[in-house]
Amino acid sequence: MREIVHLQTGQCGNQIGAAFWQTISGEHGLDGSGVYNGTSDLQLERTNVYFNEASGNKYVPRAVLVDLEPGTMDAVRAGPFGQLFRPDNFVFGQSGAGNNWAKGHYTEGAELVDQVLDVVRREAEGCDCLQGFQITHSLGGGTGAGMGTLLISKIREEFPDRMMATFSVVPSPKVSDTVVEPYNATLSVHQLVENSDETFCIDNEALYEICMRTLKLSNPSYGDLNHLVSAVMSGVTTCLRFPGQLNSDLRKLAVNMVPFPRLHFFMVGFAPLTSRGAHSFRAVTVPELTQQMYDPKNMMAASDFRNGRYLTCSAIFRGKVSMKEVEDQMRNVQNKNSAYFVEWIPNNVQTALCSIPPRGLKMSSTFVGNSTSIQELFKRVGDQFTAMFRRKAFLHWYTGEGMDEMEFTEAESNMNDLVHEYQQYQDASISEGEEDYEEEPQVENEE
């Protein structure tokens, strides 16, 4: 059955990954050591999407954990679900990439990459019918960004026809973790545009906002943020793991969501998000889910879809929901917000239904949107990149690892092209093609 191999690279990737495994182990009724003690047969029916069954009724995640320093791995191993993972699947170096993309991509990471690929190969060989890969990483650091993109391109070479989904934490506008973030992110996007099939953009600041505004947490920890991300990750793949009337998988999602191959950067959202105290005061209904799902405050990337237009979007509902109600609500939303959808893709909302809700909820929905407003995010990083690159600040760290300035220039122009492509489709209208022909003869007459 359609298996997925999961990779997590770098500190951020490993922490999000750990939260993700915690979430789906819970959904499938597995405890911290991979032993099943759930209640429903449906939980076990398709555990093999993410888990291998070992001897003694133990389920082992099909996960490869990669980092260039042992610290984060030790933390995962010592965590509540540390005994879940196969010990051979921890692949780590000793040196660390020190937030340097070049170290992750060309020097330190390149030394470790074959070891990782061996593990990936072994996991892929154990699959009946491999659906694809998912990788969690950040774009601002060294290992997740540099080595993560290296792994993606290597896996792409070896498994060209399998889906490659990435959950990428993009640098946030106000909260910067490292000074060289714009460099690392631009170099990474340059790779992702070419090698990934779908990239779910997540950003820490938007997650902070959701935690403070919606969940009413006064000082959210990274644990809270990662929990939000894992809810979305679980939602995106829920159709693979549980039966439903209208299923979708990574490939169907990509076919429905990516109108042009380079434009595969998605915004994600999740509903219902309610603060811990307010849980008991609200009934979760389909209209409310749809409402909250399309709320700009609910998006996990810091770009406001009202500044752009949706090319396509997809909604995945979980729980006991009536098909008709969902269809009506989605149509309703599209009519209300018709200004924010491009009119040259009719019916651009895809819906999927899955009958099993996440733990502790009656129903929930996951939103994935391909909006042209994501260009704000790239534009912002691009501007910061240009400001630093013009002065050649911090460049010696990268050239010292054998990188060339040309690569930076290429990455910069690729990023700018991406922004322009989004802009072009945002401005496009249905009748454009016809108008062009009418105007051309007039131009000649004027001359």
Swiss-Prot record:
Keywords assigned by UniProt, alphabetized: Cytoplasm, Cytoskeleton, GTP-binding, Magnesium, Metal-binding, Microtubule, Nucleotide-binding
Chain residues that bind Mg(2+): 69
Compositionally biased spans, kind Acidic residues: 432-447
Region Disordered, annotated ranges: 424-447
Top-level division of the source organism's lineage: Eukaryota
One GO location term (cellular component): microtubule
Described purpose of this protein according to its UniProt entry: Tubulin is the major constituent of microtubules, a cylinder consisting of laterally associated linear protofilaments composed of alpha- and beta-tubulin heterodimers. Microtubules grow by the addition of GTP-tubulin dimers to the microtubule end, where a stabilizing cap forms. Below the cap, tubulin dimers are in GDP-bound state, owing to GTPase activity of alpha-tubulin.
Protein name (Swiss-Prot/TrEMBL): Tubulin beta chain
Species annotation: Uncinula necator
Top-level taxonomy: Eukaryota, Fungi, Dikarya, Ascomycota, Pezizomycotina
